[in-house]
Design a protein with these regions (language model features):
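Short aromatic/hydrophobic "clamp" motif used to bind/position activated sugar donors
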Residues: 88
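Glycine-rich, basic loop-to-helix element that forms the pyrophosphate-binding segment
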Residues: 66-83
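A conserved acidic beta->alpha catalytic loop
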Residues: 28, 35, 43-52, 92-95
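Conserved donor NDP-sugar-binding/catalytic core segment of glycosyltransferases
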Residues: 96, 100-129
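Cell-envelope/extracellular polymer assembly enzymes that use nucleotide-activated donors
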Residues: 7-10, 38, 175
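Conserved nucleotide-sugar donor-binding catalytic segment
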Residues: 134-212, 216
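Acidic helix N-cap motif at the loop->helix transition within catalytic regions
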Residues: 20-23, 48-56, 100
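N-proximal low-complexity "stem/linker" segments adjacent to membrane-targeting elements
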Residues: 1-30
Length: 249
């Protein structure tokens, strides 16, 4: 692989007291066959063995810090600001890059502003399910079509749009990608499984995320009637909750 012709990808891991899983994420980065890469770790002043693991792999890390932050998206903003890559990918400390993931994104970037692929989801019961991303980008106006573990975005876009809006606690990544899309960013979809996403973290199946999505739709004006979509989502989720309780699922 000719490194000089491949864009540099910075993989940012944001972590806090995740020493029990961080090493696996680091190893999944090291094992990638894509050569023009950089690992950045932003730690929120962990008190467990996180720092000892970071120091163990320090020769494989381009930059790392351990300091207090104001939440996950504040830490993620530090990540892109302190990266040197052409593209940025965010990986959770309990997520894993899959074989050939970075190569699939880097080789198929073709100068696109955002490149994303598919993801495998690890559920709490140990079941792994495949999630195929749609290539119908217009769906972004309504909801997210990607997992940030399978997405690279140009650093220049983070700079142009001032990164993640920390007013959002759950969907700031969706907000940022939506703003770039509405601003004319070029998107590229790659049919390849990029990462294993651990679903044990923040759940998208919450009412809080619906309220955040409503705010995002109103702010970006991505759809004509955001309140109608908001109410439809609430009704569907409420019916599912009633059904699950009735069936004792």
């Amino acid at each position: 692989m000719d490194v000089t012709n491949m864009p540099k990808i910075s993989v940012v891991i944001v972590t806090f007291n995740s020493g029990n899983v961080l090493e696996g994420a680091i190893k999944s980065f090291i094992n990638q066959d894509y050569l023009n890469k950089e690992l950045v770790i932003i730690d929120g002043a962990s008190k467990d063995n996180t720092l000892s693991i970071i120091r163990k792999y320090e020769n494989n890390i381009g930059y790392w810090c351990s300091e207090p932050d104001h939440g996950i998206y504040d830490a993620m903003n530090k990540g892109w600001a302190r990266s040197s890559g052409d593209y940025i990918l965010y990986l959770g400390s309990d997520d894993r890059l899959l074989e050939g993931g970075l190569s699939a994104l880097g080789k198929n970037s073709s100068g696109a502003d955002l490149v994303f692929g598919d993801v495998k989801c690890l559920h709490e019961n140990g079941v792994v399910k495949e999630r195929i991303t749609t290539s119908n980008f217009e769906v972004l106006r309504i909801h997210s079509i990607f997992s940030h573990q399978s997405l690279i975005m140009k650093k220049s876009l983070f700079e142009k749009y001032n990164g993640f809006d920390c007013r959002y606690k759950l969907l700031a990544d969706y907000d940022l990608v939506l703003r770039t899309y509405l601003g004319g960013a070029k998107l590229q979809y790659v049919h390849h499984f990029i990462s294993l996403f651990n679903m044990g973290g923040v759940s998208a199946f919450t009412y809080k995320s619906d309220f955040e999505k409503l705010k995002i739709h109103k702010s970006t004006k991505s759809i004509s009637h955001p309140y109608i979509l908001f109410m439809e989502n609430l009704i569907v989720k409420s019916l599912l909750i009633v059904k699950n309780r009735w069936l004792k699922i």
